[in-house]
Amino acid sequence: MRLFVGLGNPGSKYEGNRHNIGFMVVDEIARRHGFSPWRRRFQGETSEGVLGGERVVLLKPATYMNESGRAVQEAAKFFKLGESEVVVFHDEIELPPAKMRVKVGGGIAGHNGLRSISAHLGNEYRRVRLGVGHPGVKEIVHIHVLNDFAKSERPWVAALCETVAEHAELLVSGKDSQFQNRVHLAMDAKGFATENNGGKD
């Protein structure tokens, strides 16, 4: 069994924010793979289904980003899951738009959602880092991630969410490198430049 966590802030006010791309991805996984309707649970919303023959629970914490770890800890404890069985989808300003990287453990790069999860669960969970770009000035990062994606960005956002959802079963079986490569090739084929030469790891 796996717990897939999408990070974001609850409510229509934040729906289109860059910070909410994690929510967008798990919504697309649920839609594409015919998961159960979303229901309130574990200080958030959950949807359940099967990917690659394995049971997967999707979780969208409703605690707001800074307290995401409370919901993740509650769900992981209920299902008796360790850190390695948790996959977190989150926005990553240190990656250019439309890029994606998978990482296990490591630093949190100032991401408050990851900080909260690491504090409540431990640090060795897997992260699917979804590039939203850096505004160029540290002082306006907060504004950048809490702004909606620009109209011109929406095509790659939709393509990235669809592509990640399409290949998500590779994450279930721990084939992170294969997953990353498949997403990279698919995004390239769709016309979005995702060459492996940008962003900090």
Curated annotation (Swiss-Prot):
It is found in: Cytoplasm. Its main location: cytoplasm. Transmembrane segments: none annotated. GO terms for molecular function: peptidyl-tRNA hydrolase activity; tRNA binding. It comes from the Bacteria. TRNA binds at Y14, Y64, N66, N112. The active site is at H19 (proton acceptor). It catalyses: an N-acyl-L-alpha-aminoacyl-tRNA + H2O = an N-acyl-L-amino acid + a tRNA + H(+). The keyword Endoplasmic reticulum does not apply. Its EC number is 3.1.1.29. The record marks D91 as: Stabilizes the basic form of H active site to accept a proton. GO terms for biological process: protein quality control for misfolded or incompletely synthesized proteins; rescue of stalled ribosome. InterPro entries: Pept_tRNA_hydro, Pept_tRNA_hydro_CS, Pept_tRNA_hydro_sf. The record marks N9 as: Discriminates between blocked and unblocked aminoacyl-tRNA. GO terms for cellular component: cytoplasm. Hydrolyzes ribosome-free peptidyl-tRNAs (with 1 or more amino acids incorporated), which drop off the ribosome during protein synthesis, or as a result of ribosome stalling. Monomer. Belongs to the PTH family. This is Peptidyl-tRNA hydrolase. It comes from Afipia carboxidovorans (strain ATCC 49405 / DSM 1227 / KCTC 32145 / OM5) (Oligotropha carboxidovorans).
